């Protein structure tokens, strides 16, 4: 088949949105002719990577680099400006796609990035079957969980909720939903925001994925359990819940350690929260290269995720893939990743309840490590069956028939 991908963000060796675009492009190209429309600023890193990694540089993979006039790049500064810049880029990308389709006659077009249902895509104009997503953006901090936010953070959350409603009245988004042959959403929260009349063609599928499964790192009983949390240290990631859970049981179990990997504006606040344990039993790790993350996770015994509105959670997907037992608050992407593991999920009822529940699961790991090693093996097998991008593509092709 000939496939066209719209991937505004698409770069090798990157996480988040660029990694999503790249992994879908690479995997499709193993089976089909693929054209990828992406931003022109991605060109240097893509070309450099393909020159170094010749196994990815095959005749099936074609990149079309689309840019906007330099005078418009100032719009990329700030949230509102970025949305406008992205919309203008999408309009131009659609025109490029229409012209390209006249020559190549694509079997279908898929919008891959940005992974947000609240931002416009114009690929419905190409005139071939459209797959929209996986997209996200329907997630919010659960009403029952009250976290401290400054004025700026509160405004961000208010704007987010407003944009979720506004999206359903945006003409380009409505046309995309109507025209799409299939709609893939990354979370159950986003699925619930898709109008009922389109639910029969809407499927839940994590947007993120891994190219190939790493080898499982065999876990065993240890006298000094090490817990790891990873991600951006920002307010809605709620690392404070994990730290407070650790503090609840730290005195009873003096052998455990908590390690935190990530940077962000909450770092100093979190370090202060660790109190007397900072540098002794609570450690903030230095940055780890993307290609070294699996080896890094192998040093730990339990992964905790406390994010309150994440659409994907690549860090947890990587941890499960390498055989590290994971627990998480059951919201957004983490809730999807652990949907088959009720014993590892913390329901988002209230802030204090989440702290207590996470502490209880840590304690359960300490007291019943063998059980959790078995859970980790089950999670690893589940990851092998559902997290690999090839399986997502196979599912799409099967569903389209």
What are these regions (language model features)?
Residues 19, 225, 232-248, 265-268:
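A conserved mid-protein helix/loop that constitutes part of the nucleotide-sugar donor-binding site
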Residues 62, 132, 163-216:
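Donor nucleotide-sugar binding/catalytic pocket of nucleotide-sugar-dependent glycosyltransferases
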Residues 287, 295-300:
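Short alpha-helical donor nucleotide-sugar binding micro-motif in glycosyltransferases
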Residues 325-328:
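Short hydrophobic beta-strand element within catalytic cores of glycosyltransferases
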Residues 367-400:
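A charged, aromatic-enriched C-terminal amphipathic alpha-helix characteristic of glycosyltransferases
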């Amino acid at each position: 088949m000939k496939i066209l991908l719209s991937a505004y963000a698409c770069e090798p060796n990157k996480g988040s949105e660029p990694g999503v675009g790249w992994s879908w492009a690479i995997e499709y190209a193993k089976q089909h002719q693929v054209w990828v429309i992406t931003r022109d600023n991605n060109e240097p890193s893509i070309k450099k990577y393909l020159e170094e990694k010749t196994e990815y540089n095959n005749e099936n993979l074609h990149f079309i680099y689309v840019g906007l006039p330099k005078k418009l790049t100032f719009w990329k500064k700030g949230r509102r400006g970025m949305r406008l810049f992205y919309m203008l880029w999408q309009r131009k990308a659609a025109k490029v796609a229409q012209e390209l389709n006249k020559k190549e006659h694509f079997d279908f077009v898929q919008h891959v990035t940005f992974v947000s249902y609240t931002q416009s895509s114009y690929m419905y104009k190409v005139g071939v079957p459209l797959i929209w997503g996986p997209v996200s953006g329907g997630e919010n901090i659960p009403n029952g969980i009250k976290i401290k936010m400054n004025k700026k953070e509160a405004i961000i959350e208010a704007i987010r909720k407003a944009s979720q409603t506004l999206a359903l009245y945006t003409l380009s988004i409505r046309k995309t939903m109507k025209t799409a042959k299939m709609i893939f959403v990354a979370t159950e929260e986003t699925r619930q925001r898709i109008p009922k009349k389109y639910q029969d063609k809407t499927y839940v599928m994590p947007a993120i994925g891994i190219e190939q499964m790493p080898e499982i790192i065999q876990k065993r009983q240890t006298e000094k359990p090490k817990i790891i949390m990873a991600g951006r240290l920002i307010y809605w990631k709620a690392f404070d819940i994990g730290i407070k859970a650790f503090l609840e049981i730290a005195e009873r179990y003096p052998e455990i350690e908590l390690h935190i990997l990530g940077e962000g504006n909450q770092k100093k606040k979190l370090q202060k929260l660790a109190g007397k344990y900072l540098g002794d039993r609570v450690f903030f790790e230095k940055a780890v290269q993307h290609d070294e993350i699996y080896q890094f996770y192998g040093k730990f015994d339990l992964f905790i995720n406390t994010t309150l509105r994440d659409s994907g959670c690549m860090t947890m997907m990587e941890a499960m893939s390498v055989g590290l037992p994971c627990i998480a608050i059951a919201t957004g992407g983490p809730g999807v990743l652990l949907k088959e593991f009720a014993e590892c999920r913390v329901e988002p009822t209230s802030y204090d309840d989440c702290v207590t529940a996470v502490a209880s699961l840590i304690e359960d790991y300490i007291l019943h490590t063998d059980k959790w090693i078995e859970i980790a093996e089950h999670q690893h097998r589940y990851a092998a069956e559902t997290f690999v991008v090839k399986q997502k593509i196979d599912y799409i092709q099967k569903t389209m028939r």
